[in-house]
């Protein structure tokens, strides 16, 4: 149902501005105890003043999917990192964890519905919809989501166009 709603709303986002920085901080604060309980430290570096046209609660859902996956798949005792920065005319968010790589041949499929890169890594409670939901939400916000995985580091990156009037020159990199 969540995936259906995310896909259906692709052209019907509210004509409001979402505070991406606040959304990222809220997600970090929400997941700090979850990460801690799982033996991880959640670190975050969030630039202030990032905003995008759309729905902050929906963007928070997308971040929750990425943070939840990072907690599930991070190697024991390793930190999880959430970053948000301005890159030119875009707000870029990244969730990074250390652990087993997602194989390169699986990366093109990880945002497909019901796809799981490794059936052995699931506890049976997952249906393979989380990343599809995150992608549908990001797509609805005219953004891009991608994943890089290699060398024991997996990083999910969301890039969103900044709201009108918020596009400043900058070279902050995530």
What is the role of each PLM region?
Residues 77-89:
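Short beta-strand/loop element within the Bergerat-fold HATPase_c
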Residues 14-17, 36, 41-51:
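Conserved catalytic submotifs in the C-terminal HATPase_c
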Residues 70-71:
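Short helix-loop "hinge" at the ATP-lid/N-box region of the Bergerat-fold HATPase_c
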Residues 6-13, 51-54:
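Conserved micro-motifs of the catalytic ATP-binding
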């Amino acid at each position: 149902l969540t995936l259906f709603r995310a896909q259906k709303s692709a052209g019907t986002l509210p004509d409001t501005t979402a505070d991406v920085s606040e959304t990222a901080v809220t997600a970090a604060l929400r997941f700090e105890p979850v990460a801690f309980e799982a033996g991880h430290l959640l670190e975050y570096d969030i630039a202030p003043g990032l905003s995008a046209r759309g729905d902050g609660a929906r963007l928070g859902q997308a971040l929750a999917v990425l943070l939840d996956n990072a907690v599930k798949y991070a190697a024991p005792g390793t930190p999880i990192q959430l970053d948000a920065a301005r890159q030119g005319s875009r707000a870029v968010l990244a969730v990074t964890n250390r652990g087993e790589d997602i194989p390169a041949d699986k990366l093109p499929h990880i945002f497909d519905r019901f796809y799981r890169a490794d059936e052995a890594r699931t506890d049976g409670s997952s249906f393979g919809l989380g990343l599809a939901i995150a992608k549908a939400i990001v797509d609805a916000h005219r953004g891009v989501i991608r994943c890089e995985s290699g060398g024991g580091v997996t990083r999910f990156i969301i890039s969103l166009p900044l709201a009108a009037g918020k596009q400043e020159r900058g070279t902050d990199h995530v």
